Amino acid sequence: VLLSGERTALNYLQRLSGIATYTHSVAKLLEGSETKLLDTRKTTPGMRIFEKYAVRIGGGCNHRYNLSDGVLLKDNHIDAAGGVKEAIAAAKAYAPFVRKIEVETENLDMVKEAVEAGADIIMLDNMTPEQMAEAIRVIDGRAETECSGNITKENIKTITSLGVDYVSSGALTHSAPILDISLKHLRVLEG
């Protein structure tokens, strides 16, 4: 029975073990900091629950499973609402009070607007470390901070040294190398 499902079982094992192993290697780089490593919703269709579990096993944290898990105002929401302040006001009017409101920002003007409008979490998206440092100074503890976009093993220590609360990376699930696992040495046990 095992051999009839060998390829499928190995595909799952290789993929999920690769995610857990890669996540662990990135999480080790955060040791000694207060920064939490988050995954994203960039997962394989039908595999989200398993891939997010692999991230947790590897030492990362899950951001959101789906859109109902939290309010994340992205550029298209901000544009549709007419600006950062308007998007936050609309979210506060309609979201349950227990939900944090996170805003994706791309520049310092957006960061300032998000702080003034009372965002709970401000995502610094695709910013340079210098831009992130300035944004963190502007935020000055008035909101939690999350850095995302172009996060690599090579630059993650620089980013966490800025004092960010969270670093999110889609690479944990969409770019983790698959582990080479086989059933080559499998033996039948008698009895």
Please provide the spans of the model-predicted regions:
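Acidic/glycine-rich phosphate/pyrophosphate-binding loops and surrounding catalytic core
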Residues: 1-117, 121, 130-138, 144-147, ...
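Cys/His-rich Zn2+-binding cysteine-cluster or related metal-binding knuckle/ribbon modules and their
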Residues: 153
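Positively charged, low-complexity, intrinsically disordered RNA-binding extensions
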Residues: 127
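Active-site core of metal-dependent hydrolases
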Residues: 124
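Short, charged, intrinsically disordered terminal tails
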Residues: 171-191
